[in-house]
From Swiss-Prot:
GO terms (BP aspect): DNA repair; DNA replication; negative regulation of DNA-templated transcription; proteolysis; SOS response
Protein's UniProt name: LexA repressor 2
Gene: lexA2
Organism: Xanthomonas oryzae pv. oryzae (strain KACC10331 / KXO85)
Subunit-structure text: Homodimer.
Family indicated by similarity: Belongs to the peptidase S24 family.
């Protein structure tokens, strides 16, 4: 798989940061360095680099980018406390709208360590909910939802979806000729995905944490 000029430049940046600082850049730092409008563009290029075998990414680990063939951990990872097999170390990547879609705010390097039994299937990251459109599913403003990264979802599942540069959590409904994202609060209207919109499933909802308020 041939890399684009941008992907080659991102790969060079990753190598430079690991060599200089002992840790790779975050997705936010990559997006900022290349002038991307959102972190989703950085994620797209990282996915392409991983598919090409140039890097690998460690699930559930902040700054989890590794160069292909990198035998050891980064210096930061080497001194961090190990995580047991029965717990998850999940990055909190930003916020997601349970209301009208909001601009994607992805890229925090904060993380939470918790027991695996909280979620099914196992999540890859957490997102903070903003809004109350999913309240009838028990998802409230300020909750941290677990997201299992996948591009595949069935009608009737709760998904984290991207519409253009905006992220939202809704109930997915797939019809013969249209896709709708349904709220679980009668105060909100369904979102119909238009043919000219850039739409993608980012992951499946798989449980939540409710911080003390």
């Amino acid at each position: 798989m041939d890399l684009t000029d941008t992907q080659q430049a991102i790969l060079a940046l990753i190598a430079e940061r690991i060599d200089a600082d002992g840790v790779p850049p975050s997705q936010t730092e990559i997006a900022r360095a290349f002038g991307f409008k959102g972190v989703r563009a950085a994620q797209y290029h990282l996915e392409a680099l991983e598919q090409a075998g140039a890097i690998r990414r460690v699930p559930g680990q902040a700054r989890g980018i590794r160069l292909a063939g990198q035998g050891g951990q980064t210096r930061a990872a080497a001194v961090s406390e190990p995580v047991r097999d029965d717990v998850l170390r999940l990055p909190v990547l930003g916020r997601v709208a349970a209301g009208l879609p909001i601009g994607a705010d992805i890229g925090s390097d904060d993380f939470v360590v918790l027991d695996r039994v909280f979620f099914s299937p196992s999540p890859d990251y957490l997102l903070k909910v903003q809004g109350d459109s999913m309240r009838d599913e028990g998802i409230f403003n300020g909750d941290l939802i677990g997201v299992h990264r996948t591009r595949d979802a069935r009608s009737g599942q709760i998904v984290v979806a991207r519409i253009d540069e905006e992220i939202t959590v809704k109930l997915l409904k797939i019809g013969k000729d249209r896709i709708r994202l349904l709220p679980r609060n009668p105060d909100y209207a369904p979102i119909e995905v238009l043919p000219d919109q850039d739409f993608a499933i980012e992951g499946l909802y798989c449980g939540l944490l409710r911080p003390n308020r």
